[in-house]
Amino acid sequence: MTLSPPKILLIIFSILIVVVSQSVAQDTEVSFSYNRDLRSDEVYDSKNYLTGDWGGIRGKLNNLGITPIAKYYTTILGNPVGGKKKGVQYAGLLNAYLKFDLEKLLSIKRSKFIVSGSWATGRSLSDEDIGNFFTASEVFSGRSVRLYQLFFESELLENFLRVAVGRMGIADEFSTSEIFYNYVSTAIDAHPISLAINDAAYFSDPQASWAARIHVTPTEKFYIKAGVYNSNPAVGRDSAHGVDFSFRKGVIVISEIGYLHNQKQFSKGLRGRYTFGAFYDTRKFDELASESEKQDGNYGLYWIVEQMIYREMTEDDQGLTPWAALTISPDESINTFPFFISGGFIYKGLVPNRNYDKAAFGFAYGTISDDIKDKDYELMLELTYIIQATPWLQIQPDVQWIVHPGGSSDIPNALVLGMQLVVDI
């Protein structure tokens, strides 16, 4: 018997509901979201910000339940070897958030309201000079000022259930990991790039769409979450500035199940996280071999594994953590990358007396659909080092080697050199 994609997802949802219904709620330390700038469990400390406490104003706002957050990301990258032509490009992204603690403000227990915006500048080295799929800088997000997030989130039943509704990016919560944010290339940061290449409505920072999601934590080690997101790539265009509030085209239905262990601080065991997810998009997709032909629906699967294998004795989170991610989007008639795999490792505290620095290696490899002629695969290798210069400043020199840019040997393999700066304003 052949199962259609919707039936496959229905079976997955049914299994998850049964598991949840037979479980008992317990406390957990999982944060609200993997969004790099928003952490519900983060404790306010003015020393972590470039602008400090604003003469006491920032601390007073935080006590009232209003937390302003702003981070600036910038990359300066060049390709001295290979690509379409040699070049150097700058990209910048300013993200600004207001987080309202509704329990403090309105006595609505365990609830928050988030509104955020972004200002994206610069140019893409990959688009302008290299010609590859796996764009070298995740910071480049077009050139636009836009509204980003606008959503309400609430914890229920002592954190057994979290519910969110509003404007959100799908990859802020699904198919992502904190470990991905240690990289510069979009191939890895902030989620496997194949998902967004195959489905242009698979939004991440700073793009968002109307959505609703739930997150259930039946045990300390297990979670399941599901969401419905508007599937309309046009909503994310630069000229809309994030205020195209229409709901058209279709929806992405997504679910993710995860197993976590040794997540608590000072846990004796080594931390690990294992994730599986599946999604189905109901809108119409252009066929790759003929743009005049369209197909109803698209679906994909993903797996993410990260497991610490060595921990230093001095600090809880210093040590070596390998990771891997895999995505499969079986329909080659509409998916540019039907198969994609990435992986690598992070070592925190590798250099003596640099306990907060991180060294990272990563790779990403994707096979290209047979329906796209004269293209077969693209490979990216990245070596990077994050220098935690101050509590509010990261300096990150970065090296990338891009093989088969654009999926063929027509463009010479490219060497990318440069750095990323992150300022917590």
Predicted regions and their residues:
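Outer membrane beta-barrel
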Residues: 87-233, 335-371
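Outer-membrane beta-barrel architecture
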Residues: 56-58, 97-99, 151-153, 213, ...
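Outer-membrane beta-barrel "beta-signal"
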Residues: 413-425
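Transmembrane beta-strand segments of Gram-negative outer membrane beta-barrel proteins
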Residues: 28-44, 58-81, 113-115, 123, ...
